[in-house]
Amino acid sequence: MTEKKYIVALDQGTTSSRAVVMDHDANIISVSQREFEQIYPKPGWVEHDPMEIWATQSSTLVEVLAKADISSDQIAAIGITNQRETTIVWEKETGKPIYNAIVWQCRRTAEICEHLKRDGMEEYIRNNTGLVIDPYFSGTKVKWILDHVEGSRERAKRGELLFGTVDTWLIWKMTQGRVHVTDYTNASRTMLFNIHTLDWDDKMLEVLDIPREMLPEVRRSSEVYGQTNIGGKGGTRIPISGIAGDQQAALFGQLCVKEGMAKNTYGTGCFMLMNTGEKAVKSENGLLTTIACGPTGEVNYALEGAVFMAGASIQWLRDEMKLINDAYDSEYFATKVQNTNGVYVVPAFTGLGAPYWDPYARGAIFGLTRGVNANHIIRATLESIAYQTRDVLEAMQADSGIRLHALRVDGGAVANNFLMQFQSDILGTRVERPEVREVTALGAAYLAGLAVGFWQNLDELQEKAVIEREFRPGIETTERNYRYAGWKKAVKRAMAWEEHDE
């Protein structure tokens, strides 16, 4: 029998599908990536073609093995991590989607959300699903498809249609329609799942008129769900044995599996999650309560806060403001000045996320004087990412009563040393940047590997988690508080800027 030397992680993201091969020491052996089309049928609407998601993801899987010259019988298991909330409904018989995937960013269900608020559902939804009422989550998207595709609700009741988030869709395709499952982390983002009873919530299904028959079975994040045959050399059947939504996978990949450990992912936006162990902490500060993975992939809970504009504000400096040619230049220009000369940039281009949740806030630059130049504005834009992260962390500490000792970081913007140092300064906390930057794929690989005994336990993985650089606070508390107070003042003035129709 061929030795099982590798784990494959499939990382199905918002703009691309990736496959990553890892060895027993968690080294990345090979990566393959394919982008796919973003479909914008109307302003504020975002769709993907589910068949293209499948085509790009399945081809990266074949490609990544060919690239590394690995045969499929050397693969111990496959783990899947995915863009969360994105919603697909397909025919059980043919495997054909009845509509495009409605993406997490899509705002088309705002009206359904307004109805839920008017019907007084906010408290129920917060208490039982851990979420706020927002078009972001899957529940209202499923309702929209059933409302708009003729005859679909009746077909769903007859068991002819299936719903799934992207993980569920991929596993259905990989197992030729034999397995219809999701995991607790993805289920917790649907607004249809009771995070306390760990079952689909009958009241939510009733309110949104979604037949239970179309929902997947919900399982742990680390167990064998089914087998797939990916052909290639060997043509062996490989267990699919790990699933987690992208942010929860990153939390696990950073080994934040104990209560009070937190990570922040700096991508287009920032996603910060803090593990709260076995207790679901209800937020009084605008955060979400969500399910995360404990040390063996069992259910833990986490608080989550999302910042809408992180890397996106650096892209704005580059593409719209033309102040930099490349995102990497931002660090160089930011360090050409000692400070921002009193300038604050509030990048509320699409409103503000946690903990403010103000869709009517708009971007602003405050504190301009004649002495302000482009470098000050670049620096202030980078600093805004760190300030927004502190906003979320303060909310987490208030909700959980846990004081954070270190923040683990990942995502594209963590390569910026200026930003990471300022993040540590403004939090007054250590910031730890890992050697392996692919922590989302790493999380999926860990979950899959633990389920099949490729790794025995997390202790084995702890040794492999190398911190490449640690940033420590370099400013005094008074200075930190003074700067943060300026930020709070700026945010206050940017809020409620857009008129909203009463």
From Swiss-Prot:
One Gene Ontology biological process: glycerol catabolic process
Binding locations of ATP: T14, T15, S16, T268, G311, Q315, G412
Listed Pfam families: FGGY_C, FGGY_N
Enzyme Commission designation: 2.7.1.30
Gene name of the record: glpK
Name of the protein: Glycerol kinase
Record-level Gene Ontology MF annotations: ATP binding; glycerol kinase activity; metal ion binding
Quaternary organization: Homotetramer and homodimer (in equilibrium). Heterodimer with EIIA-Glc. Binds 1 zinc ion per glycerol kinase EIIA-Glc dimer. The zinc ion is important for dimerization.
InterPro entries: ATPase_NBD, Carb_kinase_FGGY, Carb_kinase_FGGY_CS, FGGY_C, FGGY_N, Glycerol_kin
Keyword line: Allosteric enzyme, ATP-binding, Glycerol metabolism, Kinase, Metal-binding, Nucleotide-binding, Transferase, Zinc
Gene3D superfamilies in UniProt: 3.30.420.40
Pathway: Polyol metabolism; glycerol degradation via glycerol kinase pathway; sn-glycerol 3-phosphate from glycerol: step 1/1
